[in-house]
Amino acid sequence: MAAKKPTGRRVDGWKAKSWYKVYSPDNVGKVYLGDTVADDPSKLMGRVMQAPLSELVNDYTKQNVKMKFAITNVAGDAAYTSFIGHELARDFIRSLVKRRTSRIDCVVNFVSKDGCKVRATVTCFTLTRADQSQQHEIRKILTDDVLTFGKENELGVFVNNIINGDLAKELFKKVKELHPVRRVEVIKTKVELPKSSA
């Protein structure tokens, strides 16, 4: 004879959960990113949200940039995030690569003024093919300048200079003195927040 199933009221899992509105950091306009659900606010910590930069700054030309944020604070039904990285769409990057030109990548690791560990991938797209010595010099310029700027500023300043393109413009000016350049982009970043913020 089969055992009887226990009887009693079952609590619907969804009814035990609450919805939270998620917002981007202050330096990205504290824009509403969407809703997320949890049965305990502590379970929201570290949850990752993504959004195209075009939606955050109301600029359609930024649709190829994907921003990543992690929830680091919850107040009431609002969850606030910190920037943890960005990435340019691969299709967009491929469109910048032309025949008889060079693509020069460099990865720069630094700790920002406010203690965030950052890994930034910077890419230079030339107008004509660069030889090995020129590529070495270009890579050195990109690495040195990003390293200096990143270490001397807080993460928010670094992020804003990526968003508005100022960092890429300054790098472009430097590199074009050495070799004809079509474009310079910070194509990807990955951030490890200080433990107090994570």
Curated annotation (Swiss-Prot):
GO BP term, pick one: translation
InterPro entries documented for this protein: Ribosomal_eS1 (IPR001593), Ribosomal_eS1_arc (IPR030838)
GO CC annotation terms, alphabetical: ribonucleoprotein complex; ribosome
Any matching Pfam family: Ribosomal_S3Ae
GO molecular function, one term: structural constituent of ribosome
Entry keyword set: Ribonucleoprotein, Ribosomal protein
UniProt record similarity statement: Belongs to the eukaryotic ribosomal protein eS1 family.
HAMAP family: Ribosomal_eS1
Official protein name in the record: Small ribosomal subunit protein eS1
Organism: Methanospirillum hungatei JF-1 (strain ATCC 27890 / DSM 864 / NBRC 100397 / JF-1)
Gene giving rise to this polypeptide: rps3ae
